Amino acid sequence: MSQRTVFFISDGTGITAETFGNAILAQFEFKPRHVRLPFIDSVDKAHQAIRQINHAAEVEGKRPIVFTTLVNMEILAVIKTHCNGMLLDMFGMFVAPLESELGIKSNHRVGRFSDASKSKEYDDRIEAINFSLAHDDGQSNKDLAGSDVILVGVSRSGKTPTSLYLAMQYGLKASNYPLIPEDFERRQLPPALVPHRKKIFGLTIAPERLSQIRNERRPHSTYASLANCRHEIHEAEAMMRREGIRWLSTTTKSIEEISTTILQEIRPERLEY
């Protein structure tokens, strides 16, 4: 398939348009060129966006795909009227039916979804991020009891990015702790974790993938060798089984999939779905 451009247009950051659009595009086997156009909050900026869209249409000989979460109806009308792209108005698809169902009108407020700077949710997320950073890779045992979840696994199995995603996306205090050769020799969890067994969730990974990741960091080392990775994974999984720890393989899963699975398993009481 020849080159095709996808635009994500918003009068805010464009993150919602891009996230939703990418979820839809993932259903199709092609790799478009992505262009995010955030803060399109005036008619002048709308016309600038239109020029970019129409230029792509002319160069590529195909209509660009345009995902939009524009709230301002005047700006949206300008885009609809003058752009030569296939327009997918994601808010428009849902707002009108919801207005009808709820019997109330949308306030069409720009940035309402992301305007969290004054909210408790925002404060909770900042606190959770700071907590997760302070408890990354077992660097602090202080207040482990305050963790919503404690991730364990061998080095480079995905603990840190998952912890930070849980903190940033859900406001969860996620600690993570490495399982190291000394733990395998003792055949026991690190002593600091034992009192918090119910909060522990394990991450494992295919040895081949682990070796590949470690070689990017420390090539040709014992640490990154396939034999060592196989040994560590075998011991870590055996420990998780002995200790009755819930666990999953991160080998083929995205951070979002890993986090969603963890949430389904731990179901923190304070988290509303």
Swiss-Prot record:
EC number(s) per entry: 2.7.11.33, 2.7.4.28
Top-rank taxon, per record: Bacteria
Transmembrane segments: none
GO molecular function, one term: ADP binding
Keywords: Kinase, Nucleotide-binding, Serine/threonine-protein kinase, Transferase
Ligand binding (ADP): G153, V154, S155, R156, S157, G158, K159, T160
Nucleotide-binding recorded as keyword: yes
Enzyme class of the recorded protein, top EC level: transferase
Reactions the enzyme catalyzes: [pyruvate, water dikinase] + ADP = [pyruvate, water dikinase]-phosphate + AMP + H(+); [pyruvate, water dikinase]-phosphate + phosphate + H(+) = [pyruvate, water dikinase] + diphosphate
Family statement: Belongs to the pyruvate, phosphate/water dikinase regulatory protein family. PSRP subfamily.
UniProt xrefs under PANTHER family: PYRUVATE, PHOSPHATE DIKINASE REGULATORY PROTEIN 1, CHLOROPLASTIC (PTHR31756:SF3)
HAMAP family on file: PSRP
Record-given protein name: Putative phosphoenolpyruvate synthase regulatory protein
Organism, as annotated: Polaromonas sp. (strain JS666 / ATCC BAA-500)
